[in-house]
């Protein structure tokens, strides 16, 4: 995990941190720390730094909105059940902020591909124009890959498959070297898929192009319903977002929806999440969405400085700024 300057304490030591009271704001109190070496105070960035509402409130609003509630319904729920007054703009900003942060982390994870990968694009209406959401799904684990929201172009098709290649290409090469059965991609008759796969996955994966709905009549054991059945949930989510005009916000909502489905939603009580089925085992706790945000940041300043000390601290050299 990389550490930005905005999260850096004032020194790299591990013995110069002390508790220094509490920081109070609207959401309550938060532990404040002091660097005894430079006599400066700070609070750790746990993913909700300088936010006026509690982490549980923010995550509950995001979960409600992603499960199909409108902005107004989410706002009314928080007021009726928790006596918390929040504007619709705040909820919208939370979704955009944490969608981008979580996606930047989950894009670095590589799910194990155990069966076919089905690709398709679902038609949406944004700002009165036809728009398409490109996505893919693994048939056995149910893990989803989210592509761009845009036109039906070759570039958007390549963007989706570039993400799949980044996460799964090493598995394809390993299967080829060991002589195992290749991963198979399944998609409809859109020529963009065949052209893209011939460039990106040549000789390392098989394709089934132009899969029909009546697959058994064509001698096939499967069709593309694995991904097409997911389009209903996407259409229902967009239908709640009336008169939406911001394509970037639509993309954030749909990407965050797929991330929550991958890491926080079980198919039933006894089954695993798609990410766990794909070999990505993260200790997210009971509130998995909140746990996913905490994974992006350091929960405790001592843990942060210790990890920083182990990775970046060089005993023999001295910083020029503080020499």
Where are these regions (language model features)?
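Short cysteine-rich clusters marking metal-coordination/redox-active sites
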Residues: 8-12, 35-38
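Basic, short loop/linker segments at the boundary and entry of helix-turn-helix/winged-helix-like folds
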Residues: 20-66, 112
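RNase H-like nuclease fold core
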Residues: 34, 84-85, 90-180
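DNA-recognition alpha helix
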Residues: 72-84
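Acidic/histidine-rich, metal-coordinating catalytic segments
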Residues: 174-193
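RNase H-like polynucleotidyl transferase catalytic core
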Residues: 204-225
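Charged alpha-helix within mobile-element recombinases
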Residues: 223-269
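C-terminal domain-tail junction helix/linker
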Residues: 251-323
């Amino acid at each position: 995990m990389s550490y930005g300057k905005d999260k850096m304490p004032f020194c790299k030591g591990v013995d110069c941190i002390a508790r220094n009271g509490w920081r109070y704001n609207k959401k309550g109190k938060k532990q404040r720390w002091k660097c005894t070496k430079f006599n400066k105070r700070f609070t750790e960035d746990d993913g909700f730094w300088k936010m006026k509402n509690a982490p549980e409130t923010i995550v509950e609003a995001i979960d409600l909105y992603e499960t199909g509630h409108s902005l107004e319904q989410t706002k009314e729920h928080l007021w009726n059940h928790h006596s918390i007054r929040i504007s619709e703009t705040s909820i919208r900003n939370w979704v955009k902020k944490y969608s981008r942060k979580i996606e930047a982390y989950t894009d670095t994870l590589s799910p194990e591909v155990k069966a076919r990968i089905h690709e398709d694009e679902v038609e949406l209406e944004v700002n009165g124009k036809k728009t398409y959401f490109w996505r893919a799904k693994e048939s056995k684990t149910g893990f989803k890959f989210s592509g761009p929201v845009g036109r039906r172009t070759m570039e958007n098709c390549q963007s989706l498959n570039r993400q799949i290649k980044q996460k799964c290409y090493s598995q394809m090469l390993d299967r080829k070297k060991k002589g195992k059965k290749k991963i198979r991609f399944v998609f409809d008759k859109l020529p963009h898929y065949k052209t893209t796969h011939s460039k990106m996955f040549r000789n390392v994966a098989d394709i089934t192009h132009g899969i029909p709905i009546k697959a058994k009549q064509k001698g096939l054991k499967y069709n593309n319903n694995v991904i097409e059945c997911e389009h209903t949930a996407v259409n229902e989510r967009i239908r709640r977002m009336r008169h939406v005009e911001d394509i970037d916000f639509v993309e954030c909502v749909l990407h965050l929806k797929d991330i929550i489905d991958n890491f926080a939603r079980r198919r039933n009580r006894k089954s695993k999440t798609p990410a766990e089925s794909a070999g990505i085992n993260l200790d997210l706790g009971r509130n998995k969405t909140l746990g996913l945000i905490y994974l992006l940041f350091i929960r405790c300043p001592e843990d942060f400085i210790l990890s920083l000390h182990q990775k970046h601290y060089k005993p023999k050299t001295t910083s020029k700024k503080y020499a």
